[in-house]
């Protein structure tokens, strides 16, 4: 549930999809790129970088920007969905939204945060 998304976000996401000749759009917000510095512990106990083995040792300023789905918008061409059986296609576009409209309500704390942000407008 994304109550702070508005109709302009949806319209703009469709427009971006058509302009880019994309097959899908997922709304996102920028996310702290330090996630790229994390490791996964394999079943044998050895570590590997979550994305690759270079990022954990790079300066954060040199890491690529990262984006987290915010749950507000998922648009996909029905033919692509049937062919790939996934919301993610090879031509999925990110529709970046500001953090103040990227509250996804999954629990009571999220609801309280959304209410505060809504009332602040």
List PLM regions with ranges:
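Short histidine/acidic/glycine/proline-rich micro-motifs that form metal-
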Residues: 1-4, 101-102
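Hydrophobic helical membrane-anchoring modules
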Residues: 83, 94-96, 100-121
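Conserved core of the sugar-phosphate nucleotidyltransferase
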Residues: 3-91
